[in-house]
Amino acid sequence: MRLIKSLLMISMMSSLMSCQETITNDKWLATLPSPWTLTQEQMDETLPQFQQRFPDFQDRLKHIALWRVGTPYEIFKLGEEVEPDLDPIIRYDVSDCTGHNLTSLAAAKSSNWDDARNNMIKLHYKPDSNGVKQPSYKSRWHYTVDRITMNPNTVDITQSLVPKAALDSVNITLNQKEDGAEFLELDWKRTMTAYYIPNHEITPALMAKLPKIVGVAFVKPRYFKMGIVMGHEGMIIDGKYLIHASQSAGETVKLDFLKYYFPEEGAFFGGIMIFEFKENS
């Protein structure tokens, strides 16, 4: 009997400590300054704390994403710091949808500002013929579907979640409009088939299959004629919540994914692709 009581006590204490750890992590995030207010030096002090507190990479990325909720929204605010786009290579004071995903991933891979900037270059730019990633407007991953099917840091897992026969697809030449002209002046195009999860397959059962954090890219069929597949991207955490930089909200928000995706007036998108964030690539 004494042994049983001891085992029960150990079990209760273990459960209590686990609960307290979860609460502690949430409260710890609340004690941090808002990331959009921090200087580079303050980021140097903060990023190592995430490394120490969340040694698991996916857990660290998830909590960095949560920390960034509230970041002011501004679109197209990442650049190369040279003409034609003088915006900074990395920043945390404002964000748009792609900016949120990539700068959060860069932070999760890094222990200081310089590391984050260098990692952002690896995430946001294509290698040249010598394998060197040199930031330029033309070498940037401009198209989300191109990035998640070719960049080893953000890897498409759509076909591992839903059988290929149940997916929708589009054959498309990225960056080429119906009249054959380029959408962006890149001297580049790519012909590909994109497979995506149609709306009727986006269900609680699908959400239950997801890892603790994944990327989600939103398909916009009316953009196909412009050589574009995606209209938005964000993160899904815990198989339930969307964290994304929202233009309508004017900031980064966390909300129920299925409620966001299926509003009363009907879905805004034609499907989704799901991708993983990789620590090492």
Go through the PLM ranges and name each one:
Residues 4-14:
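Sec-dependent N-terminal signal peptides
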Residues 17-18:
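C-terminal motif of bacterial Sec signal peptides marking the signal peptidase cleavage site
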Residues 23-99:
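Cationic-aromatic interfacial patches
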Residues 71-196, 210-212, 220, 238-240, ...:
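Acidic/His-rich structured neighborhood in mature extracellular/periplasmic domains
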Residues 195-207, 222-223:
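Short alpha-helix capping/helix-loop boundary micro-motifs
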Residues 208-211, 228:
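Extracellular/periplasmic catalytic domains that process cell-envelope and extracellular macromolecules
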Residues 219-281:
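C-terminal soluble interaction/assembly domains
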